[in-house]
Amino acid sequence: TQPLPPACIEAMHKAVEELAGKDTFRGYGPEQGYDFLIEAIIKNDFAPRGIHFSASEIFVSDGAKSDTGNIGDILRHDNSVGVTDPIYPVYIDSNVMCGRAGVLEEETGKWSNVTYMPCTSENNFIPEIPDKRIDIVYLCYPNNPTGTTLTKPELKKWVDYALANDTLILFDAAYEAYIQDENVPHSIYEIK
């Protein structure tokens, strides 16, 4: 861990000063995110990769953990789930809490309605495409906790699987800022 860089400290000082004045205090932001932030995300994160979104398609939230849980509220409770293994625990926990994970199998510690896709040194920590239809697949790349990334052709296999099977991919790109290889997509929207 390193100390905060000067640019961050300067920005935080500026924000504190804004919050200290009656005329510049903002309180809670808009539920979808500030317009200036949404425009900056479109301009700096997606447009350089040739991905075009309108402001109404960008949602700024408080993070993947709550989004992962909340999106499950609009999905059917009997949907099957696929996760890479190992996995960010919230992907499983949120499905357990809403009843989608099925029954816990005591012998294995795994849930009956979850397909676990092993990521091991034998497969270079890249899961095999399932040989059955799964309703919802969670993918996190760069992966937490393995650090593995997928190339565009590897991610395209998942997109093709999803299109062929009417599968929803919940793609968590929380660590995309660490990607330096131009053959590794920062977003699933880079896949044609």
Predicted regions and their residues:
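Conserved core of the PLP fold type I
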Residues: 21-161, 176-192
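Generic enzyme active-site microenvironment
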Residues: 170
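Walker B catalytic acidic pair
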Residues: 173
